[in-house]
Swiss-Prot record:
Name of the featured protein: Phosphoserine aminotransferase
UniProt-annotated location(s): Cytoplasm
Necessary cofactors: pyridoxal 5'-phosphate
EC number(s) given by UniProt: 2.6.1.52
Co-factor note (free text): Binds 1 pyridoxal phosphate per subunit.
Lineage: Bacteria, Pseudomonadati, Pseudomonadota, Gammaproteobacteria, Enterobacterales
HAMAP family linked to this entry: SerC_aminotrans_5
Binding site for L-glutamate: S9, R42
Keyword Glycosyltransferase: no
């Protein structure tokens, strides 16, 4: 079968080695004669999977011992509600930084539970979309926490700065599309959450990293399945977890460790982004409208000089084995999502196609 490179924003491409192992084990996992999807989540075999997955995840991100790691349902949108329900305590407001679509979605959900103090960080610099630096973010004195999204998949905007607002500011962040792609200092955050379907594994699993002193503050109306304390007390098994997603994510963690960990991913992701943005910047046929300081390394939106060629570009790229390049309806054009599992070879195939397409149609 011809090599297919999947540039989907999520569910996203998974490492070929991981898929091959899962395929081999699908009907006879661990010598049990059954699939991992069929075994009890409370059986010793799956407990081992769960424990190894958490340990490997902690190792990859150097998660400090005073942080809990939870494997949850509900996706990022579930956490839009879970964060205020768990962290507000007796306060009624929280700071929210708006830098794009997903930050705005979190703000909309938070309004059900508190009065968000919204800081619009979006700005235009030399005609390009950008984000104000953290030094200019205006935070309130009475907020329970500050929330932001480090990587906006739709807008192709990244905030790579490390938060430094002082020890009294609880920082909550949606790392769904950038987790494990580069080193992060977990100790600078109160809550980190990430849907699995981009850099972790298949859809259906969400990972939460929460500082232990923030547990035990959940609103009385918080659903039990979103209560961090309950999930922690039950080892993320308050109800039946998404076991297959948990298992497959564990395989991804082992793949990451075998390939040099997050530091190695950071380097290769930089190479991939530089290659793709280089073709865009050295062309009058393609353009990206994000300021270089805020360009995402995970999600690269770009437009053609003549939008009438969009349909042909998508048809020909698909035929060439370059799939899921259509941009989000909000932005249009094209978008290449190049998460950890996308090899440099895939980005090279895309850039070669782009150069050839421009030669024929530019």
């Amino acid at each position: 079968m011809a090599q297919i490179f999947n540039f989907s924003s999520g569910p996203a491409m998974l490492p070929a080695e991981v898929l091959e192992q899962a395929q081999q084990e699908l009907r006879d996992w661990n010598g049990l004669g059954t699939s991992v999807m069929e075994v009890s989540h409370r059986g010793k075999e799956f407990i081992q999977v769960a424990e190894e997955a958490e340990k490997d995840f902690r190792d990859l991100l150097n998660v400090p011992s005073n942080y809990k790691v939870l494997f949850c349902h509900g996706g990022g949108r579930g956490q839009f509600a879970a964060v205020p329900l768990n962290i507000l305590g007796d306060k009624t407001t929280a700071d929210y930084v708006d830098a794009g679509y997903w930050a705005a979605s979190a703000i909309k959900e938070a309004k059900k539970y508190c009065t968000p103090n919204v800081f619009d960080a979006k700005v235009t610099v030399d005609g390009l979309r950008a984000v104000k630096p953290m030094s200019e973010w205006q935070l309130s004195d009475n907020a329970a926490y500050m929330h932001y999204c480090p990587n906006e998949t739709i807008d192709g905007i990244a905030i790579d700065e490390t938060p430094d607002f002082g020890k009294d500011v609880v920082v909550a962040a949606d790392f769904s599309s950038t987790i494990l792609s580069r080193p992060i200092d977990v100790s600078r955050y109160g809550v980190i959450y990430a849907g699995a379907q981009k850099n972790i594994g298949p859809a259906g699993l969400t990972i939460v990293i929460v500082r232990e002193d923030l547990l035990g503050k959940a609103n009385i109306a918080c659903p039990s399945i979103l209560d961090y304390s309950i999930l922690n007390d039950n080892d993320s098994m308050f109800n039946t977890p998404p076991t297959f997603a948990w298992y497959l994510s564990g395989l991804v963690f082992k793949w990451l460790k075998a390939n040099g960990g997050v530091a190695a991913m950071d380097k290769i992701n930089q190479q991939k982004a530089e290659l793709l943005y280089g073709v865009i910047d050295n062309s009058d046929f393609y353009r990206n409208d994000v300021a270089k300081a805020n360009r995402s390394r995970m999600n690269v939106p770009f437009q053609l000089a003549d939008s009438a060629l969009d349909k042909l570009f998508l048809e020909e790229s698909f035929a060439a084995g370059l799939h899921a390049l259509k941009g989000h309806r909000v932005v249009g054009g094209m978008r290449a999502s190049i998460y950890n599992a996308m090899p440099l070879e895939g980005v090279k195939a895309l850039t070669d196609f782009m150069v050839e397409f421009e030669r024929r149609h530019g």
